[in-house]
Amino acid sequence: MIIDVQHASWRRDQTMIINDISWQVQSGEHWCLLGLNGSGKTTLLNMINGYIWPTTGSINVLGEQFGSVDLREHRKKIGWVSTSMQQRLHGHEKAEKIVLSGKFASIGIYDQIEEQDHAQALSIMKQLDAERLVGRTYDTLSQGERQRILIARALMASPELLILDEPCTGLDIFSRDQLLHRVQSIATQEHAPTLLYVTHHIEEIMPCFNKTLLIRDGAVFGAGDTEAMVESNQLSSFFDTAVEVRSEPGQRYSIRLV
């Protein structure tokens, strides 16, 4: 099992942010986490990464029970792309150095870099059409280029789990589509990591995401096969608004109010 969350809750002061969530992710599954802003999606991810601890309940990730594992070493098995990660990076750092730092799950490089590490970083950047960014500093990159570098960084340690927390935020429509197709490519390659993709836009749910978790008000509204979760009746109840969902086999979803 990749992730096993059992009755996890998390409270900030007197406010319940995550409320009694139980959720399992099996090997071979790729999940989309769908919910409106403030629904608790990112908080749940922070618990899965070990950055915050559940007030009650338990979390097991990649076979390790949190509370009995070296989290710094454990995070090397988890690739993470998020706005908060982007804000922690140093703008003067060169793109390839940021990618290399992913091997150590660190901000900056404090370990010995081998020639094979450089070769791997360049190979991953090429896979993501980012090799032309070598030598560029992070603060000179566009938002789309920054996201590609963050994904390359996340892949550097060959993670077993890749978490993409609203990676299309701030992207124009063309950059968004390019990024989504790269995500699809990553998910369908041999020995791909398990993907968790967080969004509140159903048109970002690529065909590779065979499972969907619906989160509302910090609780699980529904979880299961994407075709069952992302359909008109289910999402009308989820959003508390009448909507029509359309899709074709192997294509992305669209939604409209009715």
Which residues fall in each region the model found?
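Conserved ABC transporter NBD signature motif
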Residues: 57-67, 74
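Helix-to-loop junction immediately C-terminal to a conserved catalytic motif
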Residues: 49
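Conserved ABC ATPase "signature" region
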Residues: 100, 115-133
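H-loop (His-switch) and adjacent beta-strand-loop-beta switch element
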Residues: 212-225
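Conserved ABC ATPase signature
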Residues: 137-141
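Catalytic Walker B motif of ABC-type/P-loop ATPase nucleotide-binding domains
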Residues: 162-166
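Conserved structural motif at the start of ABC-family nucleotide-binding domains
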Residues: 3, 17-20
